Amino acid sequence: MTASDPSVLSKPATGDTSFVVVIPARYQSSRLPGKVLADIDGKPMIQWVVEKAQLSGARQVIVATDNDEVAAVVNSFGAEVCKTRADHQSGTERLAEVMEKYQFSDDEIIVNVQGDEPFIPPDNIAQVANNLANQQQSSHVARMSTLAINIDSVDEAFNPNAVKVILDKDGYALYFSRATIPYDRERFLNSDATTEENIRAIGDFYLRHVGIYAYRAGFIKDYVNWPTSELEQVEALEQLRVLYQGERIHVAVANSHVPVEGVDTPEDLAKARAYATSLV
């Protein structure tokens, strides 16, 4: 990490909220196998993620993986590893096994940071934990919190790998989708619908979900006992299980700019490597 990286704080983020970061790190990936170990400017991707998490103010950072090679690499740079089973269907299910092994109290705030987010700002990790803690004082209590960023490009708005989220007036998720939501009928039915000008005219309606979650350990136990919903299966989005159960998810616009979003494809990895080498 270098001081010129805008996603890095010079010192750990501060705040009154106590939380634990768990980073699910699965080796297998249909679009980019072994991506968590992919080299980015001399370091494996998972090390970038761990170092960001360590700057967030978390009291503990744990990498959860079912893969021996990933575990060995994480151990090699001195981070904490929890070996998990290989049959989990989602990162949240992997977290549930970590909760069981570590016997965290039901009130412990757990932040799920994806293992393919090498440039996630530490400030955003602290933000999502604080947002969940503040739900205790809210009249609309959500047991899960996440973040989003504004979309201002045509490619991103219509990219199924960029998950969109729409919110109600109080900042709670109405729906997450890989589709372009909301769909502006008047603009998009026109031949010039997908111009930059038209996308920007939507204003702040277009939000891209950032794959980071905060929840209490007790909520994770509830989550894994709920059946998988059809919406979750169709969209391949684990957070839809929560909405299907009638639970709220609090969504806030991230405090800090995310310079490079999650690495899902070889093209994403190339962007991440280019960004890392651009840092002075």
Curated annotation (Swiss-Prot):
This is 3-deoxy-manno-octulosonate cytidylyltransferase. NCBIfam families: kdsB, PRK05450.1-3, PRK05450.1-5, PRK13368.1. It is found in: Cytoplasm. GO terms for cellular component: cytosol. GO terms for biological process: CMP-keto-3-deoxy-D-manno-octulosonic acid biosynthetic process; lipopolysaccharide biosynthetic process. Its main location: cytoplasm. PANTHER family: 3-DEOXY-MANNO-OCTULOSONATE CYTIDYLYLTRANSFERASE, 3-DEOXY-MANNO-OCTULOSONATE CYTIDYLYLTRANSFERASE, MITOCHONDRIAL. Pathway: Nucleotide-sugar biosynthesis; CMP-3-deoxy-D-manno-octulosonate biosynthesis; CMP-3-deoxy-D-manno-octulosonate from 3-deoxy-D-manno-octulosonate and CTP: step 1/1; Bacterial outer membrane biogenesis; lipopolysaccharide biosynthesis. GO terms for molecular function: 3-deoxy-manno-octulosonate cytidylyltransferase activity. Belongs to the KdsB family. It catalyses: 3-deoxy-alpha-D-manno-oct-2-ulosonate + CTP = CMP-3-deoxy-beta-D-manno-octulosonate + diphosphate. Activates KDO (a required 8-carbon sugar) for incorporation into bacterial lipopolysaccharide in Gram-negative bacteria. InterPro entries: Cytidylyl_trans, KdsB, Nucleotide-diphossugar_trans. The gene is kdsB. Its EC number is 2.7.7.38. It comes from Colwellia psychrerythraea (strain 34H / ATCC BAA-681). Keywords: Cytoplasm, Lipopolysaccharide biosynthesis, Nucleotidyltransferase, Transferase. It holds the Pfam family CTP_transf_3.
